[in-house]
Amino acid sequence: MIDRLMAREAIYQQSNPDPGGDPPEDGPPHGKNAADGGDEPDRGPDPDVTLRPQRMAEMVGQQDVIERLRIAIDAAQVRGEPLGHILFDGPPGLGKTTFATVIPSEMKTTVQMANGAGLKAPRDLLPYLTNVSRGSVLFIDEIHRVPRAIEEYLYTAMEDFRIDIVLGEGVNARTLNLSLEPFTLIGATTRAGMLTAPLRDRFQIREHLGWYTRKELAEIVLRNSKKLNIEVDPTSAGVIADRSRSTPRLANNRLLWVRDYAQSKTKGNVEASVCEAALDMIGIDHLGLDKQDRNYLDTLMRVFLGGPAGLDAIAHTMNVSSDTLEDEVEPFLLRSELLVRTRRGRLATPKAFEHMKRQMPDRPLS
């Protein structure tokens, strides 16, 4: 215990040059992020948490990933060892956090949850590491945002279950070796390419989460409608699934809005026409495009005659940042084959013109 307190104090002093500052309190971090500074007031259950599966048996989709994880979990339990470190990557909303919460349930252990953006210095990481128990899980979301200084502590923590703390400076410096209980680190990222190779290679299990099928999304909608105590028929579930961009999180968001709309407009009656009217009201069309998606395509077709046009030119015309378009708008348009990128710029496809009910220009689009 004394070594842990000395280590925490040493890391704090290295990270905080202000000698008058107070060291972090002993004990586990509160909430999901140590940077939060304390518990937030109770605002009632988070709908996303309420709808999230609690065990793997409740999960829909990603069955190949689930099967591989079941094998790894079973083998670890047979050996009586912690599960190997796991890295999940993929677009937002596909279940990375869900996996990070159900795996501890399957292993019958505890989980600490952190966010890479909140781990700004080694002193932010230390409370998590010193509070791991044997076989427990530490989940770091957005792990690609962890600074290099944090990574260096994770290397030995993941590989040797220890961290080395340098006490003092110069000729008086000495190293304190702090042993950790064997634990499982689960990382989640939407940008696996931003991870350094040394960190990426320390994950024994790496899984990429893919898009969900219409059938899988409809099943998710039907299951979660029961949790919300509303009746949704398969046809209505299909309408919601069609407009959810192959993403469970969006399907849940659409379902919550349809519930609110139905309770306000139709006394809770949910049918296909009600789902369509509810989603039309918030600008979600039958392909899942929202207002900004259609505004992008409209600008590309109306101003630039379908392209090719540069991203910056489109962004300036729409009065939207190019980062917003590149990160939030274009990925779905590209995946839906409504947009292509060429060396000369962005180009609307024939499918996009058909969807927007616009006539393609006579000149070849190249």
From Swiss-Prot:
Residues 213-283 are annotated as: Small ATPAse domain (RuvB-S). Residues 1-48 are annotated as: Disordered. CDD domains: AAA (cd00009). SMART domains: AAA (SM00382). Belongs to the RuvB family. DNA binds at R341, R343, R346. It catalyses: ATP + H2O = ADP + phosphate + H(+). Its EC number is 3.6.4.-. InterPro entries: AAA+_ATPase, AAA_lid_4, DNA_helicase_Holl-junc_RuvB, P-loop_NTPase, RuvB-like_N, RuvB_C, WH-like_DNA-bd_sf, WH_DNA-bd_sf. Keywords: ATP-binding, Cytoplasm, DNA damage, DNA recombination, DNA repair, DNA-binding, Hydrolase, Nucleotide-binding. It comes from the Bacteria. One of its GO terms (cellular component) is Holliday junction resolvase complex. It is found in: Cytoplasm. It is an enzyme of class 3 (hydrolase). Gene3D superfamilies: 1.10.8.60, P-loop containing nucleotide triphosphate hydrolases, Winged helix-like DNA-binding domain superfamily/Winged helix DNA-binding domain. The RuvA-RuvB-RuvC complex processes Holliday junction (HJ) DNA during genetic recombination and DNA repair, while the RuvA-RuvB complex plays an important role in the rescue of blocked DNA replication forks via replication fork reversal (RFR). RuvA specifically binds to HJ cruciform DNA, conferring on it an open structure. The RuvB hexamer acts as an ATP-dependent pump, pulling dsDNA into and through the RuvAB complex. RuvB forms 2 homohexamers on either side of HJ DNA bound by 1 or 2 RuvA tetramers; 4 subunits per hexamer contact DNA at a time. The keyword DNA-binding applies. Pfam families: AAA_lid_4, RuvB_C, RuvB_N. This is Holliday junction branch migration complex subunit RuvB. Homohexamer. Forms an RuvA(8)-RuvB(12)-Holliday junction (HJ) complex. HJ DNA is sandwiched between 2 RuvA tetramers; dsDNA enters through RuvA and exits via RuvB. An RuvB hexamer assembles on each DNA strand where it exits the tetramer. Each RuvB hexamer is contacted by two RuvA subunits (via domain III) on 2 adjacent RuvB subunits; this complex drives branch migration. In the full resolvosome a probable DNA-RuvA(4)-RuvB(12)-RuvC(2) complex forms which resolves the HJ.
